[in-house]
């Protein structure tokens, strides 16, 4: 056998020297094993492990974490369901206590209402007594002011008129008496002369007349003149005026009568008020006491069970969706990975030719072959730079950031974030159903408020009927007397006016002073009395009491207001300090909050893992930047060789699209290298003598920049002497796919 050569006892077995060397044809390799077996995996073997690719495994891990999260959420929701049902029972008990609260509060409220009514009636009694006394004295004072004012004015007018009349009569009498006597004397003198002459004439005439048997009487008017001299006005002419002056009324009788009439109804009303309200006590037992109520909304309403059943259905549906999506994604991921394996296989076969070529860094070749994708990305990024050293640094940074360890950290972080995203979607779907539970609980609260409103309204209606009966009783028995008193007072004032007018009529009736005195009385007294009567009429119309009635929401206003409050902690279904409006949704929010906190921790952990990868990549970037802008070293400092010692890279890429990258231009020390190699305890590949196309280093005007390229490790680890003296491994160059 080919592997029977002595000294080949180490594992794995290596092919004998020279069997893979070309047999006259460049690049032709003879298979080692007749059955075609190779120690590395062929294409079909690689494809058989496609389902174990990293993406499929990561997706399955994400699926496992999502299933665990769904199971955890389901368990937590079941626990929350039990707590919610327990909370519903406690809320129901609280609702029972609240709807029964009017039963316990009614007695106290009834006593408070009775005390309020009693206090109001006591105050009303005092107010009525004071008002009656005040109105009584005010009316009497007003009447006195009116009639005394009128009496003074009346006395002034009458006495003045009578005094003026009497004085005038006396003056007229004196003038008349003196004037009449003087006139009488003068008339007597004139008439005496006339009488003498007339009598003389008559006597002569009688002398002649006697002849005829007749006679003419003589004139004698002295007696009438004497009467005229003795004429004087009678002293009784001023007796009537004096009688009027002495008979001016003082209205004492009218005032006494009026005052007695006014005081009588007031005294009677006071007596009735004292008798009616003196010992009045409102009967608190007449107010109703509501019966106790019981609520059963937890038993009749299946909202909580339906909510958690719906939440469980959402979790199961989401779990099925995630299983389908992630499993399909994991299966679909096998397709590009299979295609990638095929490309990787062919790329690796193509790039394995680099091993047989000289002027390549073996470590770079191994990296390119083993990591084709990251190496291709590095080469693509490095192609943007013309400087070979910078190209190498760019490729190094990408290789540093995409090393197996770094990629493991990166993929672990991405898988964690993807798992968190799936959990967040699942949790958000559950969280969106919480308003449904809040609506159900809101219905509970509204039911409690409705029962409270009905109980409160019924109690208020019954209590208001009792209060209205008290209003009617007081209005009939107390203010009815007030109405009677005001009517009697109006009648009294009318009597006062009529009596006064009667006195005036008796005194001045038929005289010139009667009409003026009536006008003065109407002006001074009548108009004022009319105003007082209008006021008394207004009092009579408005003299009634209306105690304030109890509102229908006496016992339900606070609970109803808590439902409309913007502060959720004010809800009557919440404990003091709760952030939610009720205990039931508080249980669900606690579960969701705990899951959110756990999810946040996972996000932080995944982010920290991603940050580790970022920090690692930054280390590589910083290191590359320090070298990126560094100064080039000369030959003595380990810099590149002179341009004329470089191998000719050729005019372009080969048939596979690769460009030879020169490793070094050091002179060959083949003998020393072989001597050192043979001194090692393990066998090593022998250099195959070949007359390949790359025989010697030829200077060309197409030369690489003067930079150090391709060293990985010791500077003189590899030596190339211008011929293809690197033995290529035949394990990567078989023409057919192997298992």
Swiss-Prot record:
Protein name: Plasma membrane fusion protein prm1
Membrane topology: Multi-pass membrane protein
Transmembrane segments: 50-70, 150-169, 321-341, 396-418, 599-619
Extracellular topological domain: 1-49, 170-320, 419-598
GO biological process assignments: plasma membrane fusion involved in cytogamy
Any single GO CC term annotated in Swiss-Prot or TrEMBL for this entry: plasma membrane
Protein family (similarity comment): Belongs to the PRM1 family.
Sites where a glycan is attached: 177, 220, 245, 256, 274, 279, 283, 454, 483, 490, 498, 505, 552, 564
Record keywords: Cell membrane, Conjugation, Glycoprotein, Membrane, Transmembrane, Transmembrane helix
Entry function: Involved in cell fusion during mating by stabilizing the plasma membrane fusion event.
PANTHER family membership: PLASMA MEMBRANE FUSION PROTEIN PRM1 (PTHR31030:SF1)
Entry keyword Transmembrane: yes
Protein localization: Cell membrane
Residues covered by region (Disordered): 636-693
Lineage: Eukaryota, Fungi, Dikarya, Ascomycota, Pezizomycotina
Organism this protein belongs to: Aspergillus niger (strain ATCC MYA-4892 / CBS 513.88 / FGSC A1513)
Topological domains annotated Cytoplasmic: 71-149, 342-395, 620-739
